[in-house]
Amino acid sequence: MAAVGIAVRILMVGALPITGFCIGAQAILGFGWGARDYVRILKAAKFMLFVTVAFSIAYSAAVVVFARPLVSLFSDNENVTEIAVSSCIVFHLFFGLFGVQSFVTAMLQAFGRARLSAIVALARQGYLFIPAVLLFPVVAGFDGLLASQAIAELGAGMIALFVMFHQFGELRRALRHRGSRAIGIAG
């Protein structure tokens, strides 16, 4: 268990800056939403998405490449180190999608869509992870336990991507509608 705890701590080191960035940037999206400034919203959303995804991909790649030196900062026991290194690698396989999940959750909250935000937010450590962590260890033992985190992360990322593309489509339609309305009023 100490090895998995090390892997989770390393995972949180990457997750917390992304979460903090999204919480801070949420106010910009909320302001744009309230002002119906869809150009500002799209510009801010694309920037948020770029920053969160770039950071999460870079962080996960760095952890996968440097898993052993990172783990050795927490433990000098070889057995713990071996398990922690493999745990780090598995936990970070799909961590690049965490940036998307965090961005989508913040965006939905800024738009006042709390229920949909909860669906995205609870996927990763809730309704996708709990069944996986109960089922996969029975089927594949400890490897199944480790895989359950990666599988839940992948599933949550796919849900977040689907919702994100849908929300961007709605924003673009609102922008076109607002533009056509402005032309209709002016003409």
Residue ranges with predicted function:
Residues 1-12, 79-86, 113, 147:
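Interfacial/gating helices of multi-pass transporter permease domains
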Residues 102, 128-137:
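Transmembrane alpha-helical segments of integral membrane proteins
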Residues 8-11, 55, 123-125, 152-156:
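Transmembrane alpha-helical core residues of multi-pass small-molecule transporters
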Residues 98-101, 127, 156-159:
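Membrane-embedded alpha-helical transmembrane segments of multi-pass integral membrane proteins
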Residues 91-95, 105-106, 119-122:
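Short, glycine/charged-rich beta-strand-loop motifs at protein surfaces that mediate ligand recognition
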Residues 4-61, 65-67, 98-112, 116-117:
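Small-residue-rich hydrophobic transmembrane alpha-helices
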Residues 114-125, 129:
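Cytoplasmic juxtamembrane regions at transmembrane-helix boundaries
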